[in-house]
Amino acid sequence: MFSPTSKITTAQATIIIINYMLAAGVLTLPRTVTEQTQSPDGWISVLLGGVLAVIAGMIIAKLSQQYPKETFYEYSRHIVGKWLGHLISIVFITYFLALGAFEVRVMSEIVDFFLLEGTPSWAIIMTVLWIGLYSITQGLDPIARLFEMIFPITVIIFLTIALMSLGIFEINNLRPVLGDGIMPVLRGVKTTNLSFTCSEIMFILVAFMKKPKNAVKAVVIGTGVVTSFYMITMIMVIGALSVEGVVTRTWPGLDLMRSFEIPGLIFERFESFLLVIWIMQLFATFIITFYAASLGVSQVFKKKPLSCMFGLLPVIYILSCMPKNENDVFILGDTVSHIALYIFGALPILLLVISKWRKRGEK
């Protein structure tokens, strides 16, 4: 179940990275970035955030390639010792649990607000948790195959909607480029943390790859695809709704879909399609974080995998129910992104340096 003998291909690893990153960001990123930049240059912030994510992912991949048959939970003890390694692993587990809880709660908010109005959050959350549990019980390979089905559906629907929204796109809403200078763009970069700090999954994936030497390739391609998705989203949303229109909307991505219709087609409103694919993407992010957390508990505390999965269910449920309203949900997301920035910004570099120093000393 958690054994690295169940291998995934480089293409599957790439698709896992893409699906892991593509979650709530498409729905909320235009607003969070534009609130910081207060200009139409948010797409540049996204581009810079993507570049930083590629660099961070490459460092994590290089570190994991030093121990290609072990996950981070196993090889961290070789780098910093057993107890400190376990402590860092517990921090990682907590992060994955918090991120998974955030994705589940966002999914609940979207379903309640747009699809099943009045449905209790606990009912939606419990349903998602049990389906997620079922999805990860057989290990990473079935998860990879599920993601292979989700990804092409996402691409087709997303690009179709993007093309159809060209009818309300106004290029002047994106001008002037860098009219307020570079500083607003740099302020916007930090708000991309939650959308891009997902290359940490390589701490887990490399041990399951058939060709660990291709880990960097998977990170570069995967993050590049996600960056393209987010840039297209930023450009289309700001171009259609304007800067002022974006910052006043909670879910500007969905509001864009509501802003146009094509008479004569069987389906004249398209936000339902976007909801479908992004509920799938939120679910995809949740199950891989659930899997990563369960894997960590199993390997750190030497427990049976299935017991860890069942044991973490109430933890995720409690965390996902803690936000009392929509604002609290976004605060949780900001908190998770800040934690990720501190953990995965500097720690991989430090561990890579220590690892190389130790191996050089052994020689």
From Swiss-Prot:
Q: What is its membrane topology?
A: Multi-pass membrane protein
InterPro entries given for it? Spore_GerAB
Q: Where in the cell is it found?
A: Cell membrane
| Sequence intervals crossing the membrane | 8-28, 41-61, 84-104, 113-133, 149-169, 189-209, 218-238, 273-293, 305-325, 335-355
Organism superkingdom:
Bacteria
Tell me where it mainly resides.
Answer: membrane
The record ties this protein, via Pfam families, to: Spore_permease (PF03845)
GO CC entries: plasma membrane
Q: What does this protein do?
A: Involved in the germinative response to L-alanine. Could be an amino acid transporter.
Q: Which family does it belong to?
A: Belongs to the amino acid-polyamine-organocation (APC) superfamily. Spore germination protein (SGP) (TC 2.A.3.9) family.
Q: What's the protein here called?
A: Spore germination protein YndE
Q: Which organism is it from?
A: Bacillus subtilis (strain 168)
What taxonomic classification does the UniProt entry list for its organism? Bacteria, Bacillati, Bacillota, Bacilli, Bacillales
